[in-house]
């Protein structure tokens, strides 16, 4: 009887709610209904950021190629909402999606997502990052609100070590060709183009979010062309500051297919 009485006190109730949201958010079990009997569970108090970008602001609308999509590589999966969104859009397909995400904050989220009955045996999670495959591990700065990356932004930040994804990891998951690769990895897309040629050569389309990171957009486009890809759609990222041209979303097509 003590707890109900305490909850009647507004200041105490606010403190309880704040503590639960910060420390036990996944136990609140907030799920949002989607198309075709799918649900999006908000596992953490920053889950809404990526949910909003993908399901409300439609970040990837217009960037999905008009082909049959069965095998997807989701780099920078965060909470898995891109793969969930794509599966909702294609209810007649059982999409095999490889979700790659190095963040420890997302480990529990993606582990539970891949074990849900609607994605079991179709969604696979690797807790690894994109980088030079010759390095077994690299330093990674884990942050909330989709800001995690391998780049240090604050002097007092402490990095963690994460395993590097190697091309063989992908080849052992599913044999090529791959229909679609989505890449939103906060600047590490340069590493994707430099070190994962074998995977890209066997990928029909890729959606890549480009971030400047001391290299110009023209250099990025030149590298894409050297890999025998062409840009079929491009847009300034409307979720960043519009006056800043530091990021773009691109759909690129492999000329080999």
Language model feature labels by segment:
Residues 1-257:
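Phosphate/nucleotide-binding beta-alpha loop and adjacent structural elements of enzyme active sites
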């Amino acid at each position: 009887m003590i707890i109900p009485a305490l909850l009647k006190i507004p200041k105490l109730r606010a403190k309880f709610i704040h503590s639960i949201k910060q420390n036990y958010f996944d136990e609140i079990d907030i799920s949002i209904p989607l198309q075709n009997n799918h649900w999006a569970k908000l596992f953490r108090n920053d889950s809404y950021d990526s949910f909003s970008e993908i399901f409300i602001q439609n970040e990837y609308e217009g960037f999905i190629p008009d082909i049959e999509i069965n095998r997807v590589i989701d780099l920078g999966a965060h909470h898995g909402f891109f793969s969930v969104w794509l599966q909702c859009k294609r209810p007649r397909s059982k999409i095999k999606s490889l979700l790659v995400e190095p963040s420890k904050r997302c480990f529990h989220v993606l582990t539970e997502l891949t074990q849900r009955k609607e994605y079991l045996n179709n969604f696979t999670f690797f807790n690894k990052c994109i980088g030079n495959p010759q390095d077994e591990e690299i330093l990674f700065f884990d942050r909330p609100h989709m800001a995690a990356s391998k780049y240090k932004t604050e002097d007092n930040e402490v990095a963690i070590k994460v395993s590097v994804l190697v091309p063989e990891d992908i080849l052992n998951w599913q044999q090529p060709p791959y229909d679609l690769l989505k890449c939103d990895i906060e600047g590490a897309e340069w590493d994707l183009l430099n070190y994962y040629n074998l995977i890209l050569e066997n990928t029909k389309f890729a959606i890549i979010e480009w971030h400047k990171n001391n290299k110009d957009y023209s250099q990025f486009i030149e590298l894409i062309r050297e890999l025998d890809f062409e840009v079929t759609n491009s847009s300034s990222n409307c979720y960043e500051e519009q006056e800043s041209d530091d990021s773009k979303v691109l759909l690129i097509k492999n000329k080999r297919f």
